[in-house]
Structures are given as structure tokens and as C-alpha cells.
């Protein structure tokens, strides 16, 4: 058998796993791998990011649309440590990515060699699994294991740290390498719990379905729709659950959470049975835990056994994949008329519309509002674009007002709330979905954290539409300081550079929008452009995002103003 280097074995292993794109940044300790990658240019597209954090976020965006792990490769030391924020982000949101980092030679480990960093020790808390390869013979098996772990059970990030000597030494490549299937926890009472869940839902007077990111991760959108239609159940999404059920669906009642819709939050505490599936009851959704859903019998379904009964005790806790569970539960469900109960949600919608929505979506004078920008984008794209939102007020506005009609249409940083996520994530999303319209909605603060990825967009000739909602402030922090810190605005005002000149430097067509009359025509030009386009839209400086559940308050204490 012909011998090949560890770096060549790595490339062969990645090709075996179906890898067609790598986001990366070369350096000393990973150069043998990049040399091997040179021979795979026809099979693997390498995207040269401008910062290693961008590689991790791009891999996340790619994974969200491709439905398979995104892959990033960087060098040792600062290259590897720069990945950590992106890895932690993927861990929080259950995004499967495979990170490969170079490392100093095995003989130099522990000597404080140039660009040595204890990567395995650093990333262990924020990965599903990580491993350091010191021998080329390990490569084939370890890569297979990494992809298996990243995509099985609750998905998430894995990291392979490969020493330089393992990259250069020769080995006999084992092309048949397979990983041992991970043992899953078998619940002997699963069928009994399934029937109990069905009985609770069939007998409920005020049933309520809450769904999260687990629906999209399990590819269970069709099963969710059939289930809620069979039972006539009102259904609400978490932030990351958005687009798993079309917003236009008559049984979709809105978004949960701190800046979610009025009805879904207000009526949580009036439901008598709640089915929570593919969500983990994080603090943005529950509000004050002791006051959460006091009248409800809760059925909690999650792929991660550790999430069950972790925050909110469940009457029935079921460890299951969302797709499998819904497919088995739906035949047991009886259709009932819950129109009176759903009517309560619609009454809340009317109140929210009167107090908040109309003012935000259709301001009659003054500065442009964030909401009207999102409304126009939604109308012009018919709710079918991929919205990649950064973190802050604009994230909540995009979630609330874009009319998602197509699955896998909202990509954002949920659990970690990483500013700077959107621009690099949109790179990965566009490469995974080249035929889909990808629109990055970003705040002026977030944009400046990763704006160097405009260079990646330029070099890769990607068509990404970028909208900066520019309020010259760190808007969400400013809102909290206004509401809860006696208007003591501590370091939230931003003196920004000329974003249009920056876009010019990257050869990206752009416009500055200050006047409402100019907004719609500019959006038309942006959306019809063949390549990338940037709009810097000046929005109201002191605009607040409502509804809002104050920190520490119960969900039914949600405020409209």
C-alpha cells in the first residue's frame, strides 16, 4: 500500500466525508495541510477569510443552509484561539462544525514554542468533543469520529488539533475507517410517554405548542406543520425556531421571548397543556422561572437528555429526535376546534398592533424606523430570502417583522449573542445556498466587529446584500440604560467611520440613505443588483424595541411600551 503524509490523509478523509468547502486562514503550523489542499483545488473550495473568528462563523452559516457540518482550518496559537468565540457560538446553538487547528510538533509541546497554545484545554468546555492527533495513522479514524459526533444526537462543534509532525510523517491510509456508533440512551418508557403526551393534548382545553431550533436541526418542518394542523394547536417559535413554520400559517401565533410577540408570552401562563419541542427553556423564553406556566402540564421533548427537567420541570419528559417524535405522535392526535383559544392570541395581536406595530412599521414622520426597513425588505422579497441577522435591536426587529415563508430562512446568533456574527455567517450561507437571496441585517456596532470580511466577499465575488441599520449607538444597551439605569447613558454613543467609503474600498456598490422617500427605491436597486450591495440606512437614534419582558419579570408581565 502506498504511503502518504498525514496532511494528505487529512484531505482524503475530508473528501470521504463529503466536504466541498473549507473556510480557513493558513499559517506556520498548518502549512503541510495547506500544501496538501493545493492538490485538492478541483474538489474542495477554500474560502480565505480575513480573521479566524470569521472562519468559524462562516462555517456556522454554511452548516445552517447546507444541512451538513461546516469546516474551518487555521494555524496554531492565535489562529486557534481566534476560533473560540465562533466555536462557543456553535455550541450554544447546536451547529455542527468541524474545526481543524495546526499545532507545534509533538516534541515541542509544553515548551512554550512559537505559536503554541493549549488548544484542547481551551476548547474542551465549548465543544462536543476535541482531540489532538500526534500520529499520522490516527487521521482517518479521528476525522470519521469527529464528523459522526458533530452530527449525531444534539449537534455541535468538534475540534481536531493536529501536530506538525503528524502532518508530515508518512502512513498507510485506511480508506475504510469507520467510527463506532455512539450509544444512545434508550428510554424503556418511551411508548408509554408518547401515549400519555397524546392523551394530555387530546384532553386539553388550552393547548399550546412551543418549538425551537430542534425542528430545523431534525429537518422536521413538515412533521411540525402536519402535527399542529391535525390537532388545531396554536404554535409559537423561539428566536431560532423562526421559519420552521411559515409566519402566514393560520396556527402560527408568533415568537416567544424577551422581545417576542405579546400574545405568545402573555398567554403562556394561561395554557393548560404545553408541548415544548426542540427548545431548552432558556432564560430569554421563561422569564421568572417560578412564575412560568403555573397552570400548564408541560410535555418537554428534546434530543439532549440533559435539557429535560433542567430549567422547567415537565409532567412528561421525552428524550427524542423531533422528527421521529412528531411522526409517531401525530397519528394519536384528535382534531379539535380550538378557535376560541386561538382567538385570545389574535386579540393580543390587535393590542400589540395598536400600541406598537403600526407606529414602528408605518411611521408618518421623523427618522426612518428599523421596522419599516425590515417591512419593505419582507414585502419586496415575499418572505423568501435568507435573513442573516447580527445581535442587538436590529436582530429582534428582523425577527419580529420579516415574514418568513421558507424554511431555513433566519440565521442568527441565539444563545451566545455574538456581535459580529452576521457578515461572516452570510458568507457561509451564500456559498451553501448560491441560488437563495442572502441578506445580512446588521447594526453599526456589530458591523465594525467583523467588517474585514468584506474582503472575503469581494475576493469570492459573492452576491450578499448588506443592510446597516445605523443608529449611531449600541442600541440594545442604550435601551436598557434608558429603562433600568435612570437614563445614565454610559459609553453607548458611537462615532462611526464612513461605511460607504469602506464599501468603495472593497469594490462593493453602496448607498447612504437618510430620507424615507429614498428608502424603497434604494432597496429595489440593492435587491436587483447582480453582486453584493451595501445600504447604510440612518435610523432613529433613540428607537426602542417593544414588546419587552423586563429582566427577572414573569412572561405575562410583558410590556408594550
List each model region and its residues.
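Glycine-rich phosphate/diphosphate-binding loops that line cofactor/substrate pockets in enzymes
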Residues: 8-19, 61-67, 91, 149-154, ...
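Active-site diphosphate/adenylate-binding microenvironment
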Residues: 7-11, 15, 20, 28, ...
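Thiamine diphosphate
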Residues: 31-106, 108-110, 114-115, 263-274, 278-282, 309-311, 396-474, ...
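Glycine-rich, acidic loop regions that bind phosphate or pyrophosphate groups
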Residues: 101-142, 241-346
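Structural signature of the thiamine diphosphate
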Residues: 20-21, 64-75, 80-101, 124-176, ...
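Phosphate/pyrophosphate-binding active-site segments
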Residues: 137, 173-175, 199, 295-391, ...
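Glycine-rich, anion-gripping cofactor-binding loops and their flanking helix/strand elements
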Residues: 64, 213-299, 405-435, 448-451, ...
